[in-house]
Amino acid sequence: MTKPTFFVEEDKILANLFEEGLNNLHLYKPGSSPMYSERLLTLLGEEWSSKTTVHNHFYLKEEYKLRGIHIDDAYTEPPTGYRGNLSRTCHAISELKEAKRNSGYVFLHPVFDSQTNKEETSNFTIEELKEASRQGLIDKKVYALGGINLNNIKQIRDLGFGGVVICGDLWNRFDIHNEFDYKELLVHFTRLKKAIE
């Protein structure tokens, strides 16, 4: 998932992440002008459009031939007439069953305490997650979001999640105001990818 703010060199970093094996980028820029998302998508180019999902400005899905749209809760209806890949975020285990029925995949959030927002703490105990997995609520259609890092990524895999959404653990390795060398970020992405495989 992208940082919530735009920054210089973002398109280059994202293209490199795709080249390193990123298979689905969630373009998450809450409260931003669509013009900036359009610019980023144009800079990324058509090569990565089919691997990009947009969280707002849903018209971008068709205009840039993106993978799909993501709704940031379990209840909001997709745009009228929308036909295409749809994913959404669930904030409670009780939302998973219905959300999975109406979505290609869902995020469960926050699984662990956020690494960037100290006020965002986990909604779930490990026992609750284990029980949800035993009941089949957590499966290949559910991706873990929130506080994912190298220390807990194996636990996510063992719980039966279909994948992970990485945000803070990756972007905290690059200072958008002072750095131009993003090699450490790419190396860390490779470590995360290997840990989940």
Task: Kindly give the residue locations of the regions a language model identified.
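Short glycine-rich anion-binding loops that position phosphate/pyrophosphate groups of nucleotides
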Residues: 75, 112-113
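Non-cysteine beta-strand/loop elements that form the S-adenosyl-L-methionine
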Residues: 104-112, 167
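Charged helix-capping and loop-helix junction motifs
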Residues: 39, 120-130
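Conserved N-terminal beta1-alpha1 strand-loop-helix module at the mouth
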Residues: 1-70, 74-104, 131-134, 138-142, ...
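Paired acidic/hydrophobic, glycine-rich loop segments that form the ligand-binding mouth/hinge
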Residues: 69, 164-165
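A short acidic, helix-capping loop that chelates divalent metal ions and anchors anionic groups
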Residues: 113-119, 172-175
